[in-house]
């Protein structure tokens, strides 16, 4: 798991997300507390439960982006789910338990990759030996078995040197490689994905691991053999134990659009996709044991981060028990013109950088002036105010409209330069921004 300090986490998030300092501080402290908890003795560690977070803010201000970037920083099992995809147990739709199953699957994949990376050096040596066995077959005894020689021959060493230097990369060899598993597609009704996965695993295990002779270039064979040999060095049972422990101790679940499962108004009858989902989420958030195909997983110490716009509903519309399980509330602010300006220029791979790079592939040099960027930001803010406020996503719409002519003619403009200043922006956008009906449908 990540050992970054809260200040380092916030600094890293600042490279991609503008503003929202309170939300960044909250998630950075929560992430650091995961590390702090692991430094405690076992008896006390078991008593320290994570403080789950509820992020509240309008659409397009960075809630989901914080989750995406946090997933990369966490170096821990992480899953992002949409609350609207789930229904109450017993009804058609995904059950909330599938969140933990998916989290465990992602942990298995993460631990397997780490284990393969750890054994890469040995796997490379074993892959080299298999290729050399094809290039220089070992001597055989009277029973047709390969003789084990105490010292490798000079010819074998010479070929190993050539192989490492890449001199044999384009040479084709015929070698036995693991055959691709037969894909078994099983159609199952919604909510029965777990049964489908188990049936697919069963059919693949019945087929067994077969070898198939393939004619392939050495450089391609080397990559496949490394994966094959590294997989042999991984202990499946140990892998499952490590993955389950990683989920239980370091797992993070991000639940987006939680405001969409709030109960609205007085209604009779079962509300299976709203209040029913909240009731099913409760045991997960407060701690229970979920059965997965890899084993039983306890959710007591999994960190849950929920987010929602809460434009129609409010956090108080969540059932009281779930409100109590999300003790840390963070409100994200709506974006201003100044925020839009910074979003266009400051983050890594900002929108302006992306468009410059895209047009450079056609030999067109695009440059943005400070007053041009200011005018783009003002146009985006103005449209958000007069129509629906969709936050920073409005910049994508405005930029596409602005660059449309250049994008269309770029293939015929090789070697030309285009400067996007305030006048250019006014000529291309002002008419649309001023006409509310046009901006509603086009921007």
From Swiss-Prot:
One of its GO terms (molecular function) is peptidase activity. The keyword Chaperone applies. Belongs to the ClpX chaperone family. HslU subfamily. A double ring-shaped homohexamer of HslV is capped on each side by a ring-shaped HslU homohexamer. The assembly of the HslU/HslV complex is dependent on binding of ATP. GO terms for cellular component: HslUV protease complex. GO terms for biological process: protein unfolding; proteolysis involved in protein catabolic process. InterPro entries: AAA+_ATPase, ATP-dep_Clp_protease_ClpX, ATPase_AAA_core, Clp_ATPase_C, HslU, P-loop_NTPase. The lineage of its organism: Bacteria, Pseudomonadati, Pseudomonadota, Gammaproteobacteria, Enterobacterales. ATP binds at residues 18, 60-65, 256, 321, 393. ATPase subunit of a proteasome-like degradation complex; this subunit has chaperone activity. The binding of ATP and its subsequent hydrolysis by HslU are essential for unfolding of protein substrates subsequently hydrolyzed by HslV. HslU recognizes the N-terminal part of its protein substrates and unfolds these before they are guided to HslV for hydrolysis. It is found in: Cytoplasm. Keywords: ATP-binding, Chaperone, Cytoplasm, Nucleotide-binding, Stress response. This is ATP-dependent protease ATPase subunit HslU. The gene is hslU. It comes from Pectobacterium carotovorum subsp. carotovorum (strain PC1).
């Amino acid at each position: 798991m990540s050992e970054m300090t809260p200040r380092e986490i916030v600094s890293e998030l600042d490279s991609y997300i503008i503003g929202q300092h309170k939300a960044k501080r909250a998630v950075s402290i929560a992430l650091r507390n995961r590390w702090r908890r692991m430094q405690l003795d076992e008896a006390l560690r078991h008593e320290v439960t994570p403080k789950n977070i509820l992020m509240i803010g309008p659409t397009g201000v960075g809630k989901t982006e914080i989750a995406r970037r946090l997933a990369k920083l966490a170096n821990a099992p992480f899953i992002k789910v949409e609350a609207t995809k789930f229904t109450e147990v017993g009804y058609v739709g995904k059950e909330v338990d599938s969140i933990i199953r998916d989290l465990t699957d992602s942990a298995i994949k993460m631990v397997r990759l780490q284990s393969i990376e750890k054994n890469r050096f040995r796997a490379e040596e074993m892959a080299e030996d298999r290729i050399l066995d094809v290039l220089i077959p070992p001597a055989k005894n009277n029973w047709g078995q390969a003789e084990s020689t105490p010292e490798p021959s000079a010819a074998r060493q010479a070929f190993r040197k050539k192989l490492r230097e890449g001199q044999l990369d384009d040479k084709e060899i015929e070698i036995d490689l693991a055959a691709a598993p037969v894909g078994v597609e099983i159609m199952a009704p919604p909510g029965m994905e777990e049964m489908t996965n188990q049936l697919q695993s069963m059919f693949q295990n019945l087929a067994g691991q077969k070898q198939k002779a393939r004619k392939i270039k050495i450089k391609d064979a080397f990559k496949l053999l490394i994966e094959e040999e590294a997989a042999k060095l991984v202990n499946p049972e140990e892998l499952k134990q490590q993955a389950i422990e990683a989920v239980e101790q370091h797992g993070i679940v991000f639940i987006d659009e939680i405001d969409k499962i709030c109960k609205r108004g007085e209604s009779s009858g079962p509300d299976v996709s709203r209040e029913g989902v909240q009731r099913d989420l409760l045991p997960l958030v407060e701690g229970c044991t979920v059965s997965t195909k890899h084993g039983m997983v306890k959710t007591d110490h999994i960190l849950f981060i929920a987010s929602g716009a809460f434009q129609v509903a409010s956090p108080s519309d969540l059932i009281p028990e779930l409100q109590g399980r999300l003790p840390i509330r963070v409100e994200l602010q709506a974006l201003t013109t100044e925020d839009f300006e910074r979003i266009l220029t400051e983050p890594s791979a900002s929108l302006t950088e992306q468009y410059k790079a895209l047009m450079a592939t056609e030999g067109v040099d695009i440059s943005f002036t400070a007053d041009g960027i200011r005018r783009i930001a003002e146009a985006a803010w103005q449209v958000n105010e007069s129509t629906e406020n969709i936050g920073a996503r409005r910049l994508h719409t405005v930029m596409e409209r602005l660059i449309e002519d250049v994008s269309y003619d770029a293939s015929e403009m090789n070697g030309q330069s285009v400067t996007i200043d305030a006048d250019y922006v006014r000529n291309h956008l002002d008419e649309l921004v001023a006409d509310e009906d046009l901006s509603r449908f086009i921007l």
